[in-house]
């Protein structure tokens, strides 16, 4: 008796907990104070059910290593100048190699200890004396550093994309790594997919570079920039007509400052010209660096470069303190807002490439829900009627367990934050089928024992004992297969695997435990003499 009461109490508690987790999903207005102490998360619907956009992005992590090699080449130049080591040139070559050209062998003996001490992430590859007496030294980024930078690029890319989407205002986005260098992004209910793609994919590499001096217009037209400089496109906007044009400008290769010091970026309005611009705030370190840069380059042009395009190149009139700067250019209000978002969220450490893009309209999602629900209802009614007709009162017990099974599956989806997709509904339907199969196994075993002349209680115990192992074996092996799909599958496959896993776990509880509690109550508490199975 005591054991039966505890088992019955457990069933009631599980039922109440399941209902509590489903209340936010099916009740539009929660009671006052509910959210303070009780669950408030609804069942999340996948893109195929509510519409939205599905993206698979590939982080070009090799480019992050290449950028690291470029920075190391610039740092080498600074270190050589500081140590007064003469060099002809230092350039990044290939993917992440650095070529150092020295006037002679004397400098070669000097740079070995310097590289080993101050640049542990670089590895010495070779040193060759050229016919004219110069020495070419080849360095490369160390393998461990390559691996570290690649992993960091993917992790930072994931976090940066998540920050951008959070500021974009999409509710319940799904952003997670997939494989070694890919990121899965699902944006349910998004209204402007194209804008989202641009926002996610913008690298947002902000750089401050000096405009090269003494470069003739002929050099720019010919596309030949002097050594140590590079030609960049520059955007212009006519203040009166708002017409956009593009020209070219030559900048020094060296980046004086990047966007890593930005703490805030917000859109401001230029009242005089009725145009939008982006105001930047730097952290303490960035403020000092920007002040130092402007102090050392008064009367020179400082170009503001975003993703390889120059937006403005004002002349520095005086030292600029206070840690503030502005980006003006050919911005619409929306472009300025999006630029502020990506600058606040931080630059992507490497470009991202869209490998897969799918968009599902909300009307198609609603149609999928209606068809999925209709199919489930029709299948459920057919199953319920069959169990009632074939197993009579036993069918009633099985149908109650079936209803609890579905309730627990949906409650589990809400409790663990899983996303319900159209294949997920198929997984629930399969779960219902396996739940019925479990009850059929138990009932047929009980029928066999009753035919042998056993009492209802003895037949019940033997039937459950013999069927339980078979049911556990079938469900556990299927759960293992579902977990494999969950681990290695993508998109629809994962949605199917999630509901199947949760459903099978609920199935074992309802088919083996709940129905047994009901029959034990009837046989022990109500003392019935026959079983209607």
From Swiss-Prot:
Domain of life: Bacteria
Membrane topology of the entry: Multi-pass membrane protein
Subcellular localization: Cell inner membrane
Residue spans crossing the bilayer: 8-28, 377-397, 400-420, 422-442, 469-489, 495-515
Biological process, per Gene Ontology: intracellular protein transmembrane transport; protein targeting; protein transport by the Sec complex
Keyword list, A-Z: Cell inner membrane, Cell membrane, Membrane, Protein transport, Translocation, Transmembrane, Transmembrane helix, Transport
Major location (coarse): membrane
A GO MF term: protein-transporting ATPase activity
GO cellular component assignments: plasma membrane
Job of this protein: Part of the Sec protein translocase complex. Interacts with the SecYEG preprotein conducting channel. SecDF uses the proton motive force (PMF) to complete protein translocation after the ATP-dependent function of SecA.
Subunit relationships: Forms a complex with SecF. Part of the essential Sec protein translocation apparatus which comprises SecA, SecYEG and auxiliary proteins SecDF-YajC and YidC.
Family of this protein: Belongs to the SecD/SecF family. SecD subfamily.
Protein name per UniProt: Protein translocase subunit SecD
Organism: Syntrophobacter fumaroxidans (strain DSM 10017 / MPOB)
